[in-house]
Amino acid sequence: MQFEKTPGWLDWYAGPSKPQFVLPAGAVDAHCHVFGPGAQFPYAPERKYTPCDASKEQLFALRDHLGFEKNVIVQATCHGADNRALVDALSRSEGRARGVATVKRSISDAEIQSMHDAGVRGVRFNFVKRLVDFTPKDELLEIASRIKA
């Protein structure tokens, strides 16, 4: 499947500079994303933007280059509630990543457990209008009540 990148979206930059300081042991990049690749993990039809592909391999290489030990991978809004790219990245992270998923009220308890088993430890509620459509408060509260510690 071919996706045309939203105008103004920057391409992946393969040559980032390394920080001049050394991160402390155990440093975590606490908010990062994987985008696609769209051919394998299609972007959601309801998305508000289409990014360039930024794979798990690119993310992990960047993490290591910058000196982080771990990542928290947050579900990108362009993937909607299809968390396959996130779960795939977590499964290939060698235990060095945890995830934050986006879910709908129709998610089953088995799906919640499966994501937990993959390393998902949180659910994202996004209120940024330029990124997502409105979600009714009762739906958010229903989802929140189903998330177990």
Q: Language model features by range: what are they?
A:
Residues 1-81:
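An N-terminally biased module of ancient metal coordination in phosphate/nucleic-acid-related enzymes
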Residues 2-11, 79-149:
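Active-site gating/metal-coordination segments in enzymes
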